[in-house]
Amino acid sequence: MYEAVIGLEVHLHLKTRTKMFCGCRADYFGAEPNTHTCPVCLGLPGALPVPNRVAVEHGLRLALALGAEVPERLVFHRKNYFYPDLPKNYQISQYDLPLGRGGSLPLGERRVRIKRLHLEEDAGKSLHLEGRTLLDLNRAGSPLIELVTEPDLKTPEEARLFLQRIQALVQTLGISDASPEEGKLRADVNVSVRRVGEPLGTKVEIKNLNSFKSVQRALEYEIRRQTEILRRGEKVKQATMGFEEGSGKTYPMRTKEEEADYRYFPEPDLPPVVIPRDWLEEVRRSLPELPWEKEARYRALGIKEKDAEVLAYTPSLARFLDQALPLGLASPQALANWLLADVAGLLHERGLRLEETRLSPEGLARLVGLFERGEVTSRVAKSLLPEVLEGQDPEALVRERGLKVVADEGALKALVAEAIAAMPEAAESVRQGKVKALDALVGQVMRKTRGQARPDLVRRLLLEALGVG
């Protein structure tokens, strides 16, 4: 019996106005190539770096949220290697005094341990065409935080979930958009396979995975590959692998470097960054409610466990729900149901995000409240949702169109009698115990009321009229 052991290295672009060590704008996505550069990020002689205070503070927020230990001073190091999109031939990173050590992230019933977090600058981007390579250095020098886990993950699904949780956390903290599509969240995975109970196997790294799906697919393939090697009695070779999206297979890129290969040494142009304790405490006090704290609060409000988890780890939905709940217009679980089913379905159908609509927390809460109080039927409420999504007032729509539930039993009994007279065969079937035939009669009455009667009330009145207990 074989098992996988997985660790992740997560690279997150920090949401700052300027780059990590210079004044170039950091919003390079979609810009003309090589327009967000300067002597510092191009590595020109004599250009000196200056640390970005906002980037350091963003890093502190993440470290504190994860419960990591933050040192009294940060030291930057040069990580030396040659690659065309690294104009200095070294990357300013951190080594033995990183931003944070330890901490953990909740994942189900257990916690995934964090080994370290460190700040660094990003490299540029290479575009490989036929017979040539183009370089775009807009990204070079952009602020990154790298988060390294302990090898606590066991399956590709867990790795994917961990990345989704980290994405939700940094979005909640407001320190990163963490959009894989824009390259603002990238992951390298380290995976080895061993027999259960045996020491760790040989580690293989898969580089530059830029979507959650890619991480899962790459791990699934690599675990199968290593397992087959071990079953043949052969040894897995330590290597760095790439992942080919089309084939779903990993492929060798180069042999795996060791730390010594990078020849780390302290960055001579940057003095240590001192982290005063009062600054650290100020950052700690500014932390928002974290997703796992939010999940616990939702569950305490009576929201189902799975619903609470999805809402808490989807920042846009959590923000919306947290504005709707204090209004007291609808129950927490009903709001959760509508957000996760009806609203989510309509957004998916239209290809929209929640923040791209005019749906307000109050508007949805009023619509759900109308349904919960029995003032409109489920059918009517759902039919109004597209207009409420456009910013319409649901209560005004109900008033203007006369959509309130028909609750007058006298009027309904007359419609029930008409339905029975119009559908004698269905009525006789119900009298003979074939209760499914009742649905046709209910439908007839509902059509007469334009869907404004409560189906349960119509059903009861029909059974009474047919003399069926």
Swiss-Prot record:
A molecular-function term among this protein's GO annotations: ATP binding
Native source species: Thermus thermophilus (strain ATCC BAA-163 / DSM 7039 / HB27)
PANTHER family given in the database record: GLUTAMYL-TRNA GLN AMIDOTRANSFERASE SUBUNIT B MITOCHONDRIAL AND PROKARYOTIC PET112-RELATED, GLUTAMYL-TRNA(GLN) AMIDOTRANSFERASE SUBUNIT B, MITOCHONDRIAL
The family this protein is said to belong to: Belongs to the GatB/GatE family. GatB subfamily.
Described function: Allows the formation of correctly charged Asn-tRNA(Asn) or Gln-tRNA(Gln) through the transamidation of misacylated Asp-tRNA(Asn) or Glu-tRNA(Gln) in organisms which lack either or both of asparaginyl-tRNA or glutaminyl-tRNA synthetases. The reaction takes place in the presence of glutamine and ATP through an activated phospho-Asp-tRNA(Asn) or phospho-Glu-tRNA(Gln).
Name of the molecule in the record: Aspartyl/glutamyl-tRNA(Asn/Gln) amidotransferase subunit B
Reactions that this protein is recorded to catalyse: L-glutamyl-tRNA(Gln) + L-glutamine + ATP + H2O = L-glutaminyl-tRNA(Gln) + L-glutamate + ADP + phosphate + H(+); L-aspartyl-tRNA(Asn) + L-glutamine + ATP + H2O = L-asparaginyl-tRNA(Asn) + L-glutamate + ADP + phosphate + 2 H(+)
InterPro entries tied to this protein: Asn/Gln-tRNA_amidoTrfase_suB/E, Asn/Gln-tRNA_Trfase_suB/E_cat, Asn/Gln_amidotransferase, Asn/Gln_tRNA_amidoTrase-B-like, GatB, GatB_Yqey_C_2, Gln-tRNA_amidoTrfase_suB_CS, Gln_synth/guanido_kin_cat_dom
HAMAP family in UniProt: GatB
Keywords recorded for this protein, A-Z: ATP-binding, Ligase, Nucleotide-binding, Protein biosynthesis
Enzyme Commission number(s) from the entry: 6.3.5.-
Record text on subunit structure and interactions: Heterotrimer of A, B and C subunits.
GO biological process terms on file: glutaminyl-tRNAGln biosynthesis via transamidation; translation
